[in-house]
């Protein structure tokens, strides 16, 4: 039967007639090829592709028929469709400028097959082949944005955050031009994930936290975004930005539902965290968040050591390297190195006396400390009032009226 299809195509190529008539006849041959199965179907479809890219066939007809051809292929078995897609791309390559729209469609379908097979890298590379910026065809903003986001997401799945960042940066140039709210959300999610994978944890936390307030996002996904914001904040380097983010999350009542709330509370209240208190939280982390740093410690260990060092700076005026190492559960030399780095980077106030082997912490002013304590007290009182008003709204209304009347 494949031979019959090939013969019909050869006869039609040498015949004359209007574009409409010829297109109709080619369409009949395509339908016949689709009806076949197995190796016969494969050979017949390959013959059809070879005929369509032949320069003797009018470009008007071949474009139209290749578009029809692309609509049929997703209905075929993935193994057959994949082989046909690769064959078609190879045959079209010499005339790719003439078939940009069809090539883009083929690449989108082929990428979907690779994605189903969880072959993330090949799926991404197939989409990269679409000439979104350099081709003659003008693609609309939403199509380009969606494709760049898909490529970035696929590279993330393949644990390649460097390539993912390159394509999310391209998407960044387009996202302000798009009015598609769903695409805007996809962009924010993808960008947050890229920052997370690139270990830019505080920036990722800010993005995730922003997503957790978007009403267009389902409630369960908002809570998931909040969880990621909390995890990234805990993993971030100690400093003012992280302290602000800890305060933001601690004041968000939704965080009380999260498993990591206990760690958040300890960090916000500047309490020392012991290694045995981290096991449960460490199990919640994603694989890339469990990576080790240059000194051999995990990202979580490093973040907690820095947090504990900041907490110690609020408990002591000064401390020896030996005592600091014992407090942080690390060697004295490592404690000195981390303290030195934090002071140098302006993330902790103090200075090091290497002759006596002592870290001196600068004394905080009393007023800002009182301000923080008063702020915390007011926050707790507000929480109590809200809970009372939810439990007894009528009594609350009467009490407020009585207060106003005085």
Curated annotation (Swiss-Prot):
Keywords: Acetylation, Cytoplasm, Cytoplasmic vesicle, Nucleus, Signalosome, Synapse
PROSITE patterns: PCI
Keyword Ribonucleoprotein set for record: no
InterPro entries in UniProt: CSN4_HTH, PCI_dom, PSMD12-CSN4-like_N, PSMD12/CSN4, WH-like_DNA-bd_sf, WH_DNA-bd_sf
Domain PCI stretches: 197-366
Database matches in SUPFAM superfamilies: Winged helix' DNA-binding domain
One GO cellular component, as annotated: synaptic vesicle
Residue(s) carrying N-acetylalanine: 2
Job description of the protein: Component of the COP9 signalosome complex (CSN), a complex involved in various cellular and developmental processes. The CSN complex is an essential regulator of the ubiquitin (Ubl) conjugation pathway by mediating the deneddylation of the cullin subunits of SCF-type E3 ligase complexes, leading to decrease the Ubl ligase activity of SCF-type complexes such as SCF, CSA or DDB2. Also involved in the deneddylation of non-cullin subunits such as STON2.
Name by which UniProt lists this protein: COP9 signalosome complex subunit 4
